[in-house]
């Protein structure tokens, strides 16, 4: 608590002069603080090495429940935040397609998900990750379906209608959230010492609204690389002995 910067952000209806005066007498009156040193190792974000054979973990729960994960490395950094936002749209389309694939080809009531993570405080460490809870017998089918969705997104641009259905909920969420102070607090956190966050906020809505099918296909080609994928299976202790045991 004695090191590092203190950032105070005020939002809402208040008297600016009174607020500045209060800050000068409180936080502004504190003694200078030493910089918080961060080691190079702490800032070095590593994605796991690719695994053609899934890493295996086991659980002691129900014998008919397993989980499967496949992830691809992306990037990071506030300067590349526009790409990170485009990847969120790509992930939404991937999620919908994976869900439909299970429903159409297996009539299964699984709810697979897909996440796009783009760390703004690090220049690397981001990922696209698809995952689902399935029956142990369907683990390999999950990986096959995920590979098929990735390959299709690489080969063909998405339709304008599919893109609209993927991005519209995000745009509406931004419009709703922007009416509250918490939205601005979360978006501008750290902007005092990283002005790029002001820039990133200024293009938030535009980044989602301007994404095109061609952009998403380019991203799919860049990141859905089979040789870079990392896979994980969490299986019951009895069963699925064909994957690497990493307990």
Say what each PLM segment does.
Residues 112, 215-218:
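Mature hydrolase/peptidase catalytic cores and their serpin-fold inhibitory cores, especially
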Residues 3-11, 64-77, 81, 103-210, ...:
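M16 family metallopeptidases and their MPP-like homologs
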Residues 20-21, 140, 164, 217-218:
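Generic structural signal for individual residues within well-ordered alpha-helical segments
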Residues 7-66, 73-75, 235-247:
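An aromatic/glycine/proline-enriched structural segment found at the starts
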Residues 22-30, 73, 93-97, 101, ...:
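Generic, well-ordered alpha-helical scaffold segments in large soluble proteins
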């Amino acid at each position: 608590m004695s090191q590092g910067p203190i950032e105070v952000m005020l939002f809402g209806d208040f008297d600016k002069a009174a607020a500045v005066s209060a800050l000068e007498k409180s936080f502004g009156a504190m003694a200078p603080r030493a910089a918080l040193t961060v080691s190079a190792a702490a800032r070095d974000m590593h994605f796991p090495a690719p695994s053609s054979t899934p890493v295996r973990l086991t659980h002691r729960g129900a014998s008919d429940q397993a989980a499967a994960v496949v992830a691809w490395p992306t990037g990071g950094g506030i300067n590349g935040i526009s790409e990170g936002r485009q990847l969120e749209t790509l992930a939404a389309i991937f999620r919908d397609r994976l869900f439909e694939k299970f429903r159409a080809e297996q009539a299964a009531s699984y709810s697979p998900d897909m996440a796009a993570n783009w760390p703004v405080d690090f220049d690397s460490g981001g990922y696209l990750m698809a995952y689902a809870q399935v029956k142990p017998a369907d683990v390999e089918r999950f990986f096959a379906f995920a590979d098929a969705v990735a390959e299709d997104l690489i080969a063909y641009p998405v339709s304008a209608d599919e893109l609209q259905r993927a991005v519209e909920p995000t745009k509406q969420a931004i419009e709703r959230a922007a009416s509250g102070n918490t939205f601005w607090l979360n978006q501008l956190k750290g902007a005092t010492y990283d002005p790029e966050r002001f820039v990133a906020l200024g293009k938030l809505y535009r980044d989602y609204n301007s994404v095109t099918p061609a952009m998403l296909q380019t991203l799919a080609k860049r990141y859905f690389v089979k040789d870079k994928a990392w896979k994980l299976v969490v299986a019951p202790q009895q069963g699925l002995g064909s994957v690497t045991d990493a307990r």
